[in-house]
Curated annotation (Swiss-Prot):
Alphabetical list of CDD domains matching this protein: BTB_POZ_KCTD-like
Protein name: Uncharacterized protein DDB_G0287347
PROSITE patterns, per database record: BTB (PS50097)
SMART domains for this protein: BTB
């Protein structure tokens, strides 16, 4: 019961009931910061107090929480998914002048033309010298440079030109801190490329960070296994160098970091069993920001020479042009003969490694379901499948003891293979796969493995297969052309998606970037839950020209070997590249960026108001313009239904002016939870590496509302509004899809909005001229 009383109260404890949210604080906290509460508590006018002594204020109680926190501590923190503008209106009502000025400043600098990064700037990493703890600045950093960097989850590895390797970690309650400084084996090993992999526990914490480096010797690989102990704040590092008897152009961790695949561009593959290939360096190293490990390099190398290597060797029939992976148990390899192979352990063959042909460009055999064909049945294509480095009795083995008399013969075998591949490549006129990317998505309640290929003739090929089917091969779904076919090779591709379909992004060497949306047949409607045989549909939803965004800094592509930047077309990417571009995923539910999703599960799909489902990933493109602004373009929508009646904006959804005006050398994405995002992933960052040897981190959690929603697009469509009126006047409970004669029943009691969305989907499908055969889906 509410009643009016006199506000003169000597009690210092004040109880507030603001819109149903109850707060307890002191009188001084309120009257010293708020003109509203100063008048409320000190005036003689009557106030409304309930029977329990709470002052009742009819405002939004949830928005009052950060305001009260500021009045208590003097620090303002915007809660997750709370609008800054809404909080500002409440601050103005309560008359908290200091907070009002602070928020007004944040609103001003958060505009798309803000200065020096605005609210998106988080921190600047404090890089230090290894000789002392002096922080590196622009005046004394000429001697120490970052040569390579790689990030997985919240762990980052930096390799410097002085031979030191630094490991950095980001936590939920703290920004980047250095946990390890490690001197590599020797300065004679100039690292050319890094690749990394992580393992997580049930709490979604990164517990193991595996790092491999390809060196300038072309045949030497350095490997580090780093174990993190969060509870005792300790780190362990194990180190090993391995010599491969052929050049290494690609390498990748497999099977929970237990194996390392080393691949030559000439088709030689060596799979290294890492179980006995690591050498313990330190078992009890305390985590701190300037931890440095001393080691005896000579003793380590002597111990490494005494260990036996366990290698598996596979020889492909042609040159390798690129690699990609959709999960840690297999690796997709593209070759110059227009074929794509899958490297994996064969369960039926006692877990032996095998290589299977899964697709060939323009081969009609892959246009329909047939029985798979495995190269493991052809002894001419796979040799030395069981070769062990300790088996020196095999004269055909390309590995053996250094003192073996057949060592020259073994090297001759390698040279003969390479020479044949060179001749074959010069005479090859078939399309060359220049890049590829893969993912696992949930569609129609089933898992699908999707693969996209880019070729040197400017064509993008989209392939798919069901994960549950006991088949190795992929099947053709659609092809796309960026511009003039044959004149503009594809340099980068990305694929992701979910229940609403598949999103494909591609960029050519000339800077043309296009986005496509593909919907499978037998699509399940989000609004009714019914399966509708609509036929496959595809549409180009966006196109931008990155070459028009000239960059005076002449940025180059980062060739560090992570999941999204580790492809084979280095000459194409680095050739006259006047822009910088990366493709990444944006997690819609948890608002963070992540590297390529390798193990998406069905629980990655979430419900919106019980009606709509959407993919857990969106795509963005990041570009640096000539004014040193960071431009973010949308590569997909925010959430969608099945209709394709929308287009992506051609203008950036976000512009961040960078603080450092030197050219950006690389851009990396960081997520706390890991490269496989879950509901526990709570943050994401974008890191820019500058020529000044400085690293800046940027928060992008605010960009979610910049993505367009196709649901909103349909609601603003005149045809959609007409559909609502027609449905309200229609008492028939059945809609007939004349395109495929499938009857769709509405749910009883469905609202006009739901019915209109359903009708909009059917109209969109009826306007689609493509038939049910995905072979006919071409977009030029």
């Amino acid at each position: 019961m509410l009643h009016s009383v006199n506000s003169n109260n000597n009690n210092n404890i004040i109880k507030l009931n603001i819109g149903g949210f109850k707060y307890i604080t002191t009188r001084e906290t309120l009257i010293l910061n708020s003109s509203f509460f100063n008048g409320l508590l000190n005036s003689d006018c009557g106030t409304v107090i309930d029977s329990k002594g709470y002052y009742f204020i009819d405002r939004d109680g949830e928005l009052f929480s950060p305001i009260l926190s500021f009045m208590r501590t003097g620090t303002f923190t915007l809660p997750y998914r709370m609008s800054l503008n809404n909080v500002y209106r409440e601050v103005d009502f309560y008359g908290v002048d200091r907070l009002s000025a602070l928020i007004q400043h944040k609103i001003n600098i958060s505009n798309i033309t803000s200065v020096a990064g605005g609210i998106y700037f988080i921190s600047k990493l404090p890089l230090t010298s290894n000789n002392n703890n002096i922080i590196i600045n622009n005046s004394n950093n000429n001697n120490r440079k970052i040569l390579h960097a790689v990030i997985k989850a919240n762990i980052m590895a930096l390799y410097f030109n002085d031979g030191y390797l630094e490991i950095w970690m980001q936590g939920m309650s703290f920004q980047w801190v250095k946990i390890l400084t490690h001197l590599c084996f020797s300065n004679e090993y100039h690292i050319k490329e890094l690749t990394a992999r992580i393992l997580k526990n049930d709490l979604n914490e990164t517990t193991s960070f595996s790092l491999a480096a390809r060196t300038s010797t072309e045949r030497k690989v350095l490997i580090w296994f780093i174990d993190l102990d969060y509870h005792h704040m300790k780190v362990k590092i194990k180190e090993r160098d391995i010599t491969i008897n052929h050049d290494i152009d690609y390498f990748h961790f497999l099977i929970s970091n237990s194996f390392l695949a080393c691949i030559s561009m000439y088709g030689l593959i060596t799979i290294v069993d890492l179980a006995d290939q690591i050498n313990l360096v330190s078992n009890n190293n305390q985590i701190n920001q300037n931890n440095q490990i001393n080691q005896n390099n000579q003793n380590n190398q002597n111990n490494q020479n005494n260990q036996n290597n366990n290698f598996k060797v596979i020889i492909l029939e042609d040159r390798v042009s690129g690699i990609a992976n959709s999960n840690e148990s297999s690796l997709f390899i593209a070759c110059s003969n227009s074929k794509v192979y899958e490297l994996k352990q064969n369960i039926k063959r006692n877990w032996e490694w095998s290589i299977d042909e899964i697709y060939k460009l323009y081969d009609p055999e892959f246009f329909h379901n047939t029985f798979g064909f495995s190269l493991t049945n052809n002894n001419n294509n796979i040799t030395n499948n069981n070769t062990n480095i300790n088996n020196n009795n095999n004269p055909n083995s390309i590995y053996g003891n250094e003192n073996n008399n057949n060592n020259n013969n073994q090297q001759n075998i390698i040279n003969e293979i390479i020479n044949k591949r060179r001749i074959r490549n010069n005479n090859n006129c078939s399309p060359l796969v220049t890049c590829l990317n893969s993912s696992i998505i949930t569609n129609g309640g089933r898992l699908k493995s999707v693969l996209v290929l880019g070729t040197d003739d400017g064509v993008v090929h989209f392939l798919y297969k069901s994960v549950r089917d006991n088949m190795d091969r992929f099947y053709f779904a659609s092809t796309y052309t960026l511009c003039n076919e044959g004149d503009d090779p594809i340099s980068k591709v990305l694929i992701s998606g979910g229940e609403e379909g598949v999103f494909i992004n591609a960029i050519s060497t000339s800077g043309i970037s296009k986005s496509w949306h593909f919907i499978f047949n037998k699509q399940q409607q989000r609004v009714t839950g019914n399966s509708v045989y609509t036929g496959s549909s595809t549409k180009c939803i966006g196109c931008i020209s990155l070459s028009s965004i000239s960059n005076s800094n002449n940025l180059f592509n980062n060739n560090d070997n992570n999941d999204d930047n580790s492809f084979s077309i280095n000459d194409i990417i680095n050739n006259n590249n006047n822009y910088f571009n990366i493709f990444k995923f944006k997690n819609q539910k948890d608002l963070h960026f992540t590297s390529n999703s390798n193990n998406q599960k069905e629980n990655n799909q979430y419900n919106l108001d019980g009606n709509f489902k959407f993919s857990s990933y969106n795509q963005i493109k990041v570009v640096i313009d000539q004014s040193n602004n960071l431009l973010v373009f949308a590569g997909s929508h925010r959430n969608a239904i099945c209709a394709l009646d929308y287009e992506l904006p051609s203008t950036p959804i976000l512009i961040i002016p960078l603080m450092d005006k030197t050219k950006v050398q690389r851009i990396l994405i960081s997520t706390f939870g890991g490269c496989e995002p879950t509901i526990h992933d709570q943050s994401f960052q974008l890191l820019t590496f500058h020529q000044s040897n400085q690293i800046y981190s940027w928060s992008l959690k605010e960009i979610n509302h910049y993505f367009i929603s196709t649901t909103e697009t349909i609601l603003n469509n005149d045809n959609f509004l007409n559909n609502i009126n027609n449905i309200n006047n229609n008492n028939n409970n059945n809609n007939i899809n004349n395109n495929n004669n499938t009857i769709v029943k509405k749910r009883s009691g469905s609202s006009p909005l739901i019915s209109a969305l359903n009708n909009s989907i059917l109209n969109s499908n009826n306007n689609n001229n493509n038939d049910n055969n995905p072979i006919n889906n071409y977009d030029h």
